[in-house]
């Protein structure tokens, strides 16, 4: 399962999955237009990327697809409060990309944000994988509370579900 964050990644991964990959494969991509913050991200062809890493960052903000916009904004908000964080954007979701746990085990805190339900989600899988590799840090998981969902636009839903940048920062 792959979740490109912008049109460039969508084109790249769609071509790769159709022409080179074998077996079942899926792309998860949000409907609607391409957000400017996400459009600015390069398509590296990597299965995950650390976006503009900061020396000494002890916090990793992790997400995928359209929610990447919120972790980028959260990184900027945290920096305004003197907290250095790195953003890790997953493109391959399942199975988790090789090497992602090795990259993340150097952080004290990992906040994973995803716009799906908690149970059985990618964040839950990553939390388990981090535990299995011996990581002893704090894992924070922000997901959708499916006991109530508003009829609202995406920014309103993100705010209600505490998946917007401001809400992500409150746990750090």
Predicted regions and their residues:
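Conserved thiamine diphosphate
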Residues: 1-20, 171
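Thiamine diphosphate
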Residues: 19-172
């Amino acid at each position: 399962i792959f979740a490109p964050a912008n049109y460039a990644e969508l084109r790249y991964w769609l071509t790769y999955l159709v022409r080179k990959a074998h077996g079942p494969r899926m792309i998860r991509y949000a409907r609607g237009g391409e957000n400017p913050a996400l459009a600015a991200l390069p398509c590296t062809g990597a299965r995950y990327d650390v976006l503009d890493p900061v020396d000494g960052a002890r916090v990793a903000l992790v997400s995928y697809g359209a929610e990447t916009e919120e972790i980028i904004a959260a990184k900027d908000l945290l920096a305004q409060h003197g907290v250095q964080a790195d953003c890790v954007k997953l493109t391959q979701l399942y199975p988790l990309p090789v090497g992602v746990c090795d990259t993340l085990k150097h952080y004290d805190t990992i906040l994973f944000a995803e716009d799906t339900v908690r149970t059985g989600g990618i964040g839950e899988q990553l939390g388990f994988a981090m535990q299995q590799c011996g990581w002893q840090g704090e894992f924070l998981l922000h997901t959708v509370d499916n006991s109530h969902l508003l009829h609202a636009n995406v920014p309103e839903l993100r705010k209600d579900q505490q998946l917007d940048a401001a809400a992500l920062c409150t746990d750090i």
